[in-house]
Amino acid sequence: MMPEIEILEEKDFKIKFILKNASPALANSFRRAMKAEVPAMAVDYVDIYLNSSYFYDEVIAHRLAMLPIKTYLDRFNMQSECSCGGEGCPNCQISFRLNVEGPKVVYSGDFISDDPDVVFAIDNIPVLELFEGQQLMLEAVARLGTGREHAKFQPVSVCVYKIIPEIVVNENCNGCGDCIEACPRNVFEKDGDKVRVKNVMACSMCGECVEVCEMNAISVNETNNFLFTVEGTGALPVREVMKKALEILRSKAEEMNKIIEEIQ
């Protein structure tokens, strides 16, 4: 059977889905591709011309690097693939400028971008506070990169999965309820004089229910279905991250097939 994806829940920055008919290797490859292979924009270096705040230049640069930037993959090249040879041009990088005086809290929305569409994804993130008489003037240059290079380029902040198990309660069950009390995830409930599974998605496969069941009525088995939870940073829509990750995996698989054919 071919792997399938079933969307369970989708919000602005979060998505839950089931990856069906997949091996653990495929599930983990998909997770790693979303975190480490899909490109996103991030501040790469900062030129600070004036800083009389209480913060060191390095601290400000680090904070800017971790701010998610709205990313348009069709409008920018990776610097390693750009015609400028990686020196930096409008096709592979963009600048954000700031010139402010205190007293003021500097927010991510205060920065002026070369492109009005390419801005920090969330405009109310506080960067630092300037007090009376303090100034900050800088230029931050952003480019595309991947999480393999640095965490600041990851388009997702959370990308995890768990196996969806198969839980079987057989005819040996006497309805004692020990498994209900032992289960830390509230997976079981009483059903007359028996026990039934009410929330298999919550199961962490800890095995507590199997341990306490003296009747050997419960079995918990692995399946080929995985529950994914993915939260984006705002740099890219989560669906686009998923789609791009699948494209990358397909490209890698095709490249591997070519290598194998050449060897044969």
UniProtKB/Swiss-Prot annotation:
Leading EC class: transferase
GO cellular component terms listed in the entry, alphabetical order: cytoplasm; DNA-directed RNA polymerase complex
Reaction catalysed by this enzyme: RNA(n) + a ribonucleoside 5'-triphosphate = RNA(n+1) + diphosphate
Keywords (A to Z) from UniProt: 3Fe-4S, Cytoplasm, DNA-directed RNA polymerase, Iron, Iron-sulfur, Metal-binding, Nucleotidyltransferase, Transcription, Transferase
Compartment(s) where it occurs, according to its Swiss-Prot or TrEMBL record: Cytoplasm
BP terms from Gene Ontology: DNA-templated transcription
Protein name per the record: DNA-directed RNA polymerase subunit Rpo3
Pfam families per the UniProt record, alphabetical: Fer4_9, RNA_pol_A_bac, RNA_pol_L
EC number(s) recorded for this UniProt protein: 2.7.7.6
Residues where [3Fe-4S] cluster binds: C203, C206, C209
Similarity comment text for this entry: Belongs to the archaeal Rpo3/eukaryotic RPB3 RNA polymerase subunit family.
MF term (GO), any: 3 iron, 4 sulfur cluster binding
Family matches, as SUPFAM superfamilies: Insert subdomain of RNA polymerase alpha subunit, RBP11-like subunits of RNA polymerase
Cofactor note: Binds 1 [3Fe-4S] cluster.
Its job: DNA-dependent RNA polymerase (RNAP) catalyzes the transcription of DNA into RNA using the four ribonucleoside triphosphates as substrates.
Subunit structure: Part of the RNA polymerase complex.
Organism of origin: Archaeoglobus fulgidus (strain ATCC 49558 / DSM 4304 / JCM 9628 / NBRC 100126 / VC-16)
Cofactor(s) demanded: [3Fe-4S] cluster
